[in-house]
């Protein structure tokens, strides 16, 4: 008599590959791999991790609890994870020229929460870039912890240039007397003046914190000014341009080490995710290589090529423009305020072509955030796949043509398919199991 699958012993299930243990989840994982391989990922906050990072995150380190810090754990058996966390911290410090690093934050938002806890008190005034002008939820949005537990004030971009203007920040700082000024952004295409912002913070007696989650990879490659010499504390994610696992980390001057360590653990988190910290260590090593710098240069080149194509007459004639007239970073902000097309429609149109982006609000947006009047388009993931100028010109033309007149979607999709085929992602990995 054949035993029912339900009669399997726990050991059978323990040792079974995912295709046998949970075919439903395995099928979805395979479908997601296919989606990533066969489309073009251009969401500015997304990237592809190296295989070595996938291996680290899928390792036996996922089994280990390690509350505390290396040499000061609250659990036994931490000899190996202590080594890994120490390596990750030292690599982060070396990569960014920082005195201190904490690699335990589970995410960028957790890292940011720890910064608040370490530098300011509940009810203190903080001053950050407005969300609808390119800021982040954790920079003071009212429904976020940062806007609920702190008195959040905002500065916006210059209404004529759409650029962050230090003089506007200074005036807002003089008006609001913040305990902390926040630099960094999630949807802004230019470089901030960290030196000027630090001078403003000093003038009003505020701490200066920069969230470099989006541009950390560019900083690591030496292709973007570093906030580390100017900011009291710098937070970041390890993914986005840096191309590591989805997670966060914090850099700072040594004088803030004790407060930040306590804010991360036990202030915000319990046990760190050691398999993710191993992935961060690998990503930091990769980011220190010439290969990574070349990838970041191609990322910047691709963004400029895209911006130039989207400023062509056929796109302009559809009421579409590029915010600030170009880009200095890995993303382009497309302005649809004068177009009949809204952000949701633009996102859906490009999805039909096989290109994934996201709609985004733009400064002074007349439309609700659910549809928005902007598109945020990033070039990091394509550089990771190996795209160079020729390929960026092709994908830029696909996007420009689609937005200009909604040309034959099937023909545009065929061009996308060819690009994806020519630059395979994780070649040889056809199934998760």
UniProtKB/Swiss-Prot annotation:
**Positions bound to (6S)-5,6,7,8-tetrahydrofolate:** 131, 135-137
| Cellular component terms (Gene Ontology) | cytosol
> Is this entry keyworded Cytoplasm?
yes
> What EC class is this?
transferase
Q: Which reaction does it catalyse?
A: (6R)-5,10-methylene-5,6,7,8-tetrahydrofolate + glycine + H2O = (6S)-5,6,7,8-tetrahydrofolate + L-serine
Query: Where, subcellularly, is it found?
Result: Cytoplasm
| Keyword annotations | Amino-acid biosynthesis, Cytoplasm, One-carbon metabolism, Pyridoxal phosphate, Transferase
EC numbers for this chain: 2.1.2.1
Q: Which cofactor does it need?
A: pyridoxal 5'-phosphate
Give the superkingdom in one word.
Bacteria
Q: Where is this site: Plays an important role in substrate specificity?
A: 239
Q: Which GO terms describe its molecular function?
A: glycine hydroxymethyltransferase activity; pyridoxal phosphate binding
Q: In which pathway does it act?
A: One-carbon metabolism; tetrahydrofolate interconversion; Amino-acid biosynthesis; glycine biosynthesis; glycine from L-serine: step 1/1
Please list the residues that carry the modification N6-(pyridoxal phosphate)lysine: 240
Q: Does the keyword Kinase apply?
A: no
- Entry's InterPro entries? PyrdxlP-dep_Trfase (IPR015424), PyrdxlP-dep_Trfase_major (IPR015421), PyrdxlP-dep_Trfase_small (IPR015422), Ser_HO-MeTrfase (IPR001085), Ser_HO-MeTrfase-like (IPR049943), SHMT-like_dom (IPR039429)
Its function? Catalyzes the reversible interconversion of serine and glycine with tetrahydrofolate (THF) serving as the one-carbon carrier. This reaction serves as the major source of one-carbon groups required for the biosynthesis of purines, thymidylate, methionine, and other important biomolecules. Also exhibits THF-independent aldolase activity toward beta-hydroxyamino acids, producing glycine and aldehydes, via a retro-aldol mechanism.
Q: How does it assemble?
A: Homodimer.
Q: Can you tell me which family this protein belongs to?
A: Belongs to the SHMT family.
Q: Which NCBIfam families match?
A: PRK00011.1
User: What protein name is recorded for this chain?
Assistant: Serine hydroxymethyltransferase
